[in-house]
A protein has these predicted regions:
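Bacterial N-terminal signal peptides that target proteins for export
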Residues: 1-9
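C-terminal motif of bacterial Sec signal peptides marking the signal peptidase cleavage site
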Residues: 17-20
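Short, glycine-/small- and polar/acidic-enriched structural segments
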Residues: 28-169, 174-185, 204, 214
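Secondary-structure end/capping motifs
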Residues: 228-307
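Conserved C-terminal helix/tail region of periplasmic/extracytoplasmic solute-binding proteins
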Residues: 297-327
Length: 327
């Protein structure tokens, strides 16, 4: 009897050792490394990316995603070259790139409507582009910026040549009312910060001036080559990102805290108020987050061609796709 017990015990030990060995030898899941390059310093336009990283949405899709800021080269350049698989850019940039034969593609609209516009101190009494004549405009020197200004001024009956352009203006709070009377701001960030500071501004939303300028800004981009070589990875990335932005819409306070955890140098009040603002804007009136309409692209492309921003027109449905958004 003792012999039977001893044999049974030895067999059990052998089985346990085999199971332990199998567990040790089980191959670890290899995550595919992916880089996404931001357009600027981290802010609430990017929160969905940080949420997807923090809550494991990328890992669920088999991805190890690194979020980086642009260096000497622009985001468009590093994505076009393949040094970054994905990036945050703008509809204007994608149109300009494609007109030059650079195959960038927009995969999703981060925000459904353009939340940027022209801001001035309330004391300046500027309420319309018709009042831009004789004023100083602080420019960040983008290719389409002055053409947009010219259009909205002429639409209001004003003479664009009577607007003084001050080049290289980037910090709204140190320049407005000093170096410039009018500047172009993103209301969800700079506008929120101004309100936090108690500044009284007149703000003119760009989308209210002309439907052409209710374009997508920012957008998530990739290189067209990547869509052909690894479409499943693109689909996996976008599934995780979509889940991240849907979380931002449902949980603005928690998502703000996630952004602050990853970028602790950001102002807490600014991030939380901006996140609350964007919770209603990310998806807005679209059926789902990220969805892009052909007419929005077509309008801007036609305007850019008519105003000689681009020398050759662009096929709108080649510049963007909704195919990689989750159902």
């Amino acid at each position: 009897m003792r012999r039977i017990v001893l044999i049974a015990t030895n067999l059990l030990l052998v089985l346990l050792m085999l199971v332990a060995c199998q567990k040790k030898e089980a191959p670890a899941v290899t995550l595919k490394k992916v880089v996404v390059t931001l357009d600027w310093t981290p802010n609430t336009n990017h929160t969905g990316l940080y949420v997807a990283k923090e809550l494991g949405y990328f890992e669920e899709q088999g991805l190890d995603v690194e979020i980086v800021q642009p260096g000497q080269n622009t985001t468009d350049q590093v994505v076009a070259s393949g040094n970054s698989q994905f990036g945050i850019s703008y509809q204007e940039n994608v149109v300009l790139a494609r007109a030059q034969g650079i195959p960038l593609v927009s995969l999703a609209a981060v925000i459904q409507h353009n939340t940027s516009g022209f801001a001035s101190l309330k004391s300046a009494g500027i309420n319309s582009p018709a009042q831009f004549e004789g004023k100083r405009y602080g420019s960040w020197d983008s290719p389409s910026e002055l053409a947009i200004l010219k259009t909205v001024m002429e639409d209001s009956g004003a003479d664009f040549s009577k607007l003084q352009i001050v080049s290289g203006v980037y910090d709204f709070f140190t320049t407005i009312g000093k170096d410039a009377d009018i500047e172009w701001i993103y209301d969800a960030w700079t506008g929120v910060e101004a309100r936090n500071k108690g500044m009284e501004l007149n703000y003119i939303p760009l989308k209210d001036l002309n439907p052409v300028f209710d374009y997508y800004t920012p957008v998530i981009i990739c290189n067209e080559t990547l869509l052909g070589s690894d479409p499943e990875m693109v689909r996996s990335f976008m599934a995780a990102v979509s889940k991240g932005y849907e979380y931002c819409i449902a949980e603005p306070v928690k998502s703000a805290d996630i952004l602050l955890k990853h970028v602790p140098e950001l102002d807490v009040e600014l991030v939380r108020n901006s996140q609350g603002y964007l919770a209603a804007e990310y998806k807005s009136d679209a059926a789902k987050w990220g969805y892009q309409k052909n007419e929005v692209w077509r309008r801007f492309i036609d305007w850019a061609f008519d105003n000689r921003i681009i020398e050759t027109s662009v096929i709108s449905d080649k510049a963007f796709t909704n195919d990689y958004l989750p159902e």
